Design a protein with these regions (language model features):
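Intrinsic structural disorder
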Residues: 1-2, 178
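His/Asp/Glu-rich, glycine-adjacent segments
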Residues: 2-119, 124-133
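Hydrophobic/aromatic residues located in beta-strands of well-ordered beta-sheets
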Residues: 73, 166-168
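Short, glycine/charged-enriched secondary-structure capping and boundary segments
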Residues: 89-91, 136-138, 178
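Structured core elements
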Residues: 122, 168-169
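A long, amphipathic alpha-helix that forms part
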Residues: 128-166
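Histidine-centered active-site microenvironments of extracellular/periplasmic hydrolases
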Residues: 172-178
């Protein structure tokens, strides 16, 4: 069972998933946080301040780093996330494969899996979350994005050996507020 930590923001949740620790331990407690060393607010997702070292901010070994001592590890996500501060803080370890769209990432993931007998893969889909934040979780756009994700996952899992374990999770839920 996976239990969401509080707060259920993308930064806090991805860091908890990546480290196995609650936000109070790994230090990535929200979208924007105060960096006491600089006495300024820094963004934990995409716009880290150059004065903040992601490995110092979140110094604990990640699940991916620990697993890579025993088997191949690959992260599949958008190209811009390959060496992002968020990745270096919370999801570092192993190799990276990328694709600009859902279907391109499915192909990249399938290729990475075909090259190894056993592996741990972290596969990130951001499109559904992005669409929900922009249009709302009850919108036709969100429904279309969910259908596209479902289709991609069906294509991806159809290629997997029958003894493959696939875990699907989200970094947070979504409720329309306006």
């Amino acid at each position: 069972t996976l239990t969401a930590a509080f707060p259920t923001t993308t930064a806090a949740s991805l860091a908890s998933l990546g480290t196995g620790l609650p936000p109070g331990q790994h230090g990535m407690v929200g979208y924007d946080v105060l960096d006491p060393a600089q006495d300024k607010v820094v963004n934990m997702l995409g716009n880290w301040d150059p004065g903040v070292d992601p490995r110092r901010w979140q110094p604990f070994p990640t699940v991916l780093e620990q697993a890579s001592e025993h088997l191949p590890v690959t992260t599949v996500s958008l190209p811009r996330f390959a060496d992002s501060a968020m990745t270096r803080a919370a999801l570092r370890g192993g190799s990276h494969a990328s694709g600009t769209g859902i279907h391109a990432r499915v192909e990249a993931a399938s290729g990475a899996l075909a090259a190894e007998k056993r592996m741990l893969m972290y596969f990130y889909f951001n499109e559904l979350d992005k669409t929900g934040h922009r249009y709302g979780a009850q919108s036709p756009e969100w429904g279309g994005s969910l259908e596209e994700l479902d289709s991609a996952l069906k294509r991806f899992t159809a290629k997997l050996p029958p003894d493959t374990l696939v875990l699907l999770t989200a970094d947070h839920g979504m409720v329309d507020t306006a």
